[in-house]
Amino acid sequence: MDRVLVAMSGGVDSSVTAALLKEQGYEVIGGTMEIFPDYEQPPLDEGGCCSLSSIEDARRVAHHIGIRHYTFNLKKVFEEEVINNFVNEYKNARTPNPCVVCNNEIKFRSLLKKALELDADYIATGHYAIVEHNVNGKHLLKKAKDVDKDQTYMLYGLTQFQLSHTLMPLGNYTKQEVRQMAKDFGFRIHNKPESQEICFVPDNNYTRFLDENYPGLGKPGPVMDTDGNILGKHKGLHHYTIGQRRGLGISLGYPVYVVKLDREKNAVIIGPEEEVYSKSLIANKVNWISIDKLTEPIKVTARIRYNSPESHAKIYPVNDNEVKVVFDKKQRAVTPGQSVVFYDGKVVVGGGIIKENF
């Protein structure tokens, strides 16, 4: 009997994952991560995956379905890998995606290590995605049945080794079906609301988190147009992101948007909306899933943020770590620090971190 460690957050998806795998004959162990930094008070309510009540919810579900449950203290590695990266990206005038880093470094590295230490064959999560093992020698990541819930954008960084030890049973179900299963399993959390915020910033106010915990991260500087004319003053680059319109404090008689964050000049560059669009980007820290490496240009569809639609593009190799992406049509607010993920139909080809746009 294969043993699987299920990453249980206390939410509907991971709870149903554990119950489904037990029904399918796996020896299931539940594991919940403690990752909330000590300097931020963890919420008591049911809001986020890190709340104290969520750990209790996970324990209750594990007891309800009759499986062992462990709590793993991953605060140190979470701070080192996720929070420090989050802070450094803002420090370098980029807009990070901490969920991508968390999946790569915490769930599918640190937690997988715990799973292997427990002699588990697999780790399982409640992600809406499909993992297909040993397809022509590859472990593939594919889009979920529920296109509105598909989470492959957050998972493009998984390696072949990680995928070979990963199960994602919810990929073939809709969210509505999963909630019904939670109800059928008798879980009291079947109507629990989904967490929308960054888990370590439960009020979703990331500038408050940065200003309170990392004072001096950003310094005031000029707001400039694309010709270099100074139009005003900003309160720190981490308060802004590409495409932002609100909160600029600039009135030019027409709508203006953040076009670029210039770290060298500590300047926020603004312009009319057409200047927010770009046709190309360079991405680095590239990871490939369905191919070994990119040796020649290929056509793909690409997604530049979690909730954006895919767009047709061609990707060109720059070196082993970088690619150039040229879109068929200009894209709005291509944001350094965010991820770009490449698809061939339902299959994830790979992805990387946006370095620059042009």
UniProtKB/Swiss-Prot annotation:
Compartments (UniProt record): Cytoplasm
Binding site for ATP: A7, M8, S9, G10, G11, V12, D13, S14, M33, G126
Disulfide partners: C102-C199
Catalytic residues as annotated in Swiss-Prot or TrEMBL: C102, C199
InterPro entries cross-referenced by the UniProt entry: MnmA-like, MnmA-like_C, MnmA-like_central, MnmA-like_central_sf, Rossmann-like_a/b/a_fold
Enzyme Commission number(s): 2.8.1.13
Xref: Gene3D superfamilies: Adenine nucleotide alpha hydrolases-like domains, HUPs, Translation factors
Catalyzed chemical reaction(s): S-sulfanyl-L-cysteinyl-[protein] + uridine(34) in tRNA + AH2 + ATP = 2-thiouridine(34) in tRNA + L-cysteinyl-[protein] + A + AMP + diphosphate + H(+)
One Pfam family here: tRNA_Me_trans
Keyword Nucleotide-binding belongs to the record: yes
UniProt region (Interaction with tRNA), positions on chain: 149-151, 305-306
Primary location class: cytoplasm
Entry GO CC: cytoplasm
Keywords of the record: ATP-binding, Cytoplasm, Disulfide bond, Nucleotide-binding, RNA-binding, Transferase, tRNA processing, tRNA-binding
One GO biological process term: tRNA wobble position uridine thiolation
Feature type site, description Interaction with tRNA: H127, Q338
GO molecular function, one term: tRNA-uridine 2-sulfurtransferase activity
PANTHER family with a match to the protein in the record: MITOCHONDRIAL TRNA-SPECIFIC 2-THIOURIDYLASE 1 (PTHR11933:SF5), TRNA 5-METHYLAMINOMETHYL-2-THIOURIDYLATE -METHYLTRANSFERASE (PTHR11933)
Protein task: Catalyzes the 2-thiolation of uridine at the wobble position (U34) of tRNA, leading to the formation of s(2)U34.
Stated family: Belongs to the MnmA/TRMU family.
Protein name: tRNA-specific 2-thiouridylase MnmA
